[in-house]
Amino acid sequence: MGELTEFQKKRLENIKRNNDLLKKLNLNNVSSQIKREAGVEDEHLDRKRKKKAGSAKKAVKKEPKPAAIPTRRSRRLRGENVDGNGIPNVNDNQLLKMGQSDSTPELEAIDELKNTALSGDVKLSDLIKSENEEELLDKFKSFANKNFSSGDFFKELQQQQVPTPEIKQLQEDFDLKLYDIFQPNEIKLTAERISATFFHPSVDKKLVICGDTAGNVGLWNVRETQPEDELEEPDITKVKLFTKNVGRIDTYATDSSRLLAASYDGYLRSINLQDMNSEEILVLKNEYDDPLGISDFQFNYNDPNVLFMTTLSGEFTTFDVRTKPTEINLKRLSDKKIGSFSINPKRPYEIATGSLDRTLKIWDTRKIVNKPEWSQYEDFASHEIVATYDSRLSVSAVSYSPMDETLVCNGYDDTIRLFDVSGTLPEDLQPKLTLKHNCQTGRWTSILKARFKLNMDVFAIANMKRAIDIYTSSGVQLAHLPTATVPAVISWHPTQNWVVGGNSSGKAFLFT
């Protein structure tokens, strides 16, 4: 036999290393034990028995063939509990860690530290190894002094229809172009799937903030001119502030130099763009002191210091951001997750909620119902229901138009529904218009949510056919902005015709 090649030597080393690891884990004995418990005999023993039987004298009576049995039956399928001696259900990295018993305590300590929520007030420069504190402050100071108060076949249909002059003008206004100074695959704001986006209200310079499913927050200082250096990268600052999904990002209604971000880990934190400090505003907990994931929040139109919030378990509460958190008064609006809510700008005491319980409900927050009949929870008060729409599948998003009293919702039934909410509402709410739309996501794409622009009766929603679609409140499509991937989580600039969408790999598509 000739000399082994380098590839063959490497392969033998891998086989030896894997065998050593399997010996440490004692998997051979475990495998034999599972076979015995499942009633499966070893194939080698079967062959030996057959050979021995063949060499003996002819049998007088032919034995019937045994009934076929499954080659393997797991304990889970047999309804048995795992006793700790079975083959561990782990991935390759975890398997290697198990084989390195001397380093397990340290690895466990690191994993525990990664899952520990960030508590108290912090400097972002302390969390970002690659950033100098002075450079970090200079980068965002320009955003700290701004005052701000609170269709897949589009082209084909456009050619067949004769729009009104008003619609034609809107279509021209929203014929937006994709930002091209950097390619979208270079604009990576977060490490994981984007779950929240926000367009800062500054007009002189653009700032886009995104949060992801791992609790990371990325701030993109958008460059307006071509860089002199071809190797220059987008100006993105990344920091990990939470341990779970970032559910919502906004600015304070009274101070746009302060950002506010909420997470599924129950934390509400601010980011001051002037000094780049992050302050812990609130940790939302239930009566058992367990964190309540914050799914959505919005500042009240009547009082810009009061925050309305909803939770992953169906509660609703209000909080004055000027005060220190004390006892939180929770009201139950659903027995399941509230994924989205919106405050009616014409009647700020009314809110609409979209829930996993397949309903859109409108509530009067001035009125309390101590024992709601619809809830299975006896100890929770609620608010009074004004109107309800029952959907075939869960309702993902709700959003009020700023001026003409239209409410939009979308969900997993691949529709966008528009409701007229002016005047007195019937208990059984029915849409004025239903649009078919490709908006049902899978597990790898964030939920698509229709969002009205703050200063116009125009809303946008991502399309699973890789685009952002823009509509009027009467359902007329104004634009179909194609993208390379699904820009699932969108955000409008509050005053300009700019929109941004974030995808499942942490990247952003900006249209201006």
Curated annotation (Swiss-Prot):
The keyword Repeat applies. The keyword Repeat applies. Residues 34-46 have a biased composition (Basic and acidic residues). Residues 47-60 have a biased composition (Basic residues). One of its GO terms (cellular component) is nucleus. Residues 32-96 are annotated as: Disordered. SUPFAM superfamilies: WD40 repeat-like. GO terms for molecular function: DNA binding. It comes from the Eukaryota. Gene3D superfamilies: YVTN repeat-like/Quinoprotein amine dehydrogenase. Pfam families: WD40 (PF00400). InterPro entries: WD40/YVTN_repeat-like_dom_sf (IPR015943), WD40_repeat_CS (IPR019775), WD40_repeat_dom_sf (IPR036322), WD40_rpt (IPR001680), WD_repeat_DNA-damage-binding (IPR050853). Keywords: DNA damage, DNA-binding, Repeat, WD repeat. WD repeats lie at residues 189-230, 241-281, 289-329, 333-373, 390-429, 442-481, 482-512. DNA-binding protein that binds to both single- and double-stranded DNA. Binds preferentially to UV-damaged DNA. May be involved in DNA-metabolic processes. Belongs to the WD repeat DDB2/WDR76 family. This is DNA damage-binding protein CMR1. It comes from Kluyveromyces lactis (strain ATCC 8585 / CBS 2359 / DSM 70799 / NBRC 1267 / NRRL Y-1140 / WM37) (Yeast).
